[in-house]
């Protein structure tokens, strides 16, 4: 078998998105990739909802987007986090008035210069928080219908800034309804907001997502390799510097060892493009040369839609890799076969 894949071969075998069995774990570590992958659909819903203030509910249903995911988009854009949602729940009865006849809570708001009234269908409820709304962690991947609670929260996040109570519970942030149907403004507003959010959260998320990616590969390798093979995350090998007499410990995402034989493995799974793959590509030639000088081997597990957008970097890695595979179990099994072939030679 030819383990030295071309870019085209690797992409053909790639899965591009996180495997289903990891989706809950990944969602718990970071909701950002989920938001970005559904961003175009979210933008389309806002663009198509400019005729009347509650048209958005019809569009949400037609788009078949989960209500909690749509709400999460609004929460992120409004920067209306968990503490504010809790505060809204606790102060709801003090913030919004009630109908004299029915005692229902309501909200007077403005849409395109006209006054409207929304009667709350579910709020207030006890213990309003992110968990009840299923917008945090692994709950974000659950499919939730557009219930009365979601309708109430969506209306607040869209139009809260236009109410008389805008200065209470952070409602001044809830302004997205003012741009519904305004296509160019929507696109600029959302992309700028997500760029800001991405900068804040992506660094923190990259490490945890990288650990998830490495652990998954380790688990599958351990399943396919003999028990007397050592499979270690963040393993180090003492390698000679080819330009001097010095030796340094070089880290690999995963290190597989048996007797005096070693395979260093680098793992990169990026749904959204970033510079990690460029860094690995820049090191690829030197790392392979140093490993080969000790009669060791280097392999790469490369996947994710973001990585394949940086084709030059992936091509460089393929050129200086002894075995390159994608991220599915069947692909990692190919890597296991490569390791056994080398160790048994």
Curated annotation (Swiss-Prot):
Pfam family, one: RE_BanI
Top EC category: hydrolase
GO molecular function (one): type II site-specific deoxyribonuclease activity
Domain of life: Bacteria
BP GO terms, sorted: DNA restriction-modification system
Catalyzed reactions: Endonucleolytic cleavage of DNA to give specific double-stranded fragments with terminal 5'-phosphates
The EC number(s) this enzyme carries: 3.1.21.4
Annotated keywords: Endonuclease, Hydrolase, Nuclease, Restriction system
Protein name, per record: Type II restriction enzyme HgiCI
Source organism of this protein record: Herpetosiphon aurantiacus (Herpetosiphon giganteus)
Lineage: Bacteria, Bacillati, Chloroflexota, Chloroflexia, Herpetosiphonales
């Amino acid at each position: 078998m030819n383990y030295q894949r071309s870019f085209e071969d690797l992409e053909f075998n790639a899965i591009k998105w996180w495997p289903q069995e990891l989706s809950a774990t990944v969602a718990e570590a970071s909701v950002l990739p989920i938001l970005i992958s559904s961003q175009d659909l979210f933008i389309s819903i806002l663009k198509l909802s400019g005729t009347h203030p509650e048209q958005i509910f019809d569009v949400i249903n037609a788009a078949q987007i989960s209500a909690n995911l749509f709400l999460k988009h609004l929460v992120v854009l409004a920067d209306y986090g968990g503490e504010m949602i809790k505060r809204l729940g606790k102060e709801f009865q003090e913030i919004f008035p009630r109908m004299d006849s029915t005692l229902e809570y309501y909200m007077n708001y403005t849409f395109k210069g006209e006054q409207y009234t929304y009667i709350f269908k579910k709020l207030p409820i006890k213990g309003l928080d992110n968990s009840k709304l299923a917008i945090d962690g692994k709950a974000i991947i659950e499919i939730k219908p557009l219930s009365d609670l979601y309708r109430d929260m969506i209306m607040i996040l869209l139009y809260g800034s236009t109410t008389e109570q805008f200065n209470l519970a952070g409602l001044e942030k809830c302004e997205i309804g003012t741009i519904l149907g305004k296509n160019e403004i929507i696109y600029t507003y959302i992309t700028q907001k997500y760029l800001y959010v991405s900068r804040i959260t992506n660094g923190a998320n990259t490490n945890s997502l990288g650990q998830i990616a490495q652990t998954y590969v380790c688990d599958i390798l351990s399943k396919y390799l003999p028990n007397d093979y050592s499979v270690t995350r963040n393993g180090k090998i003492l390698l000679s510097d080819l330009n001097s007499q010095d030796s340094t410990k070089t880290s690999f995402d995963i290190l597989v060892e048996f007797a005096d034989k070693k395979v260093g493995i680098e793992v990169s799974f990026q749904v959204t493009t970033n510079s990690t793959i460029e860094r690995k590509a820049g090191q690829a030639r030197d790392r392979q040369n140093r490993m080969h000088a000790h009669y060791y081997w280097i392999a790469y597990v490369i996947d994710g839609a973001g990585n394949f957008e940086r084709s030059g970097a992936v091509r460089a890695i393929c050129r200086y890799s002894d075995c390159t595979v994608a991220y599915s179990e069947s692909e990692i099994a190919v890597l296991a076969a490569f390791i056994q072939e080398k160790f048994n030679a």
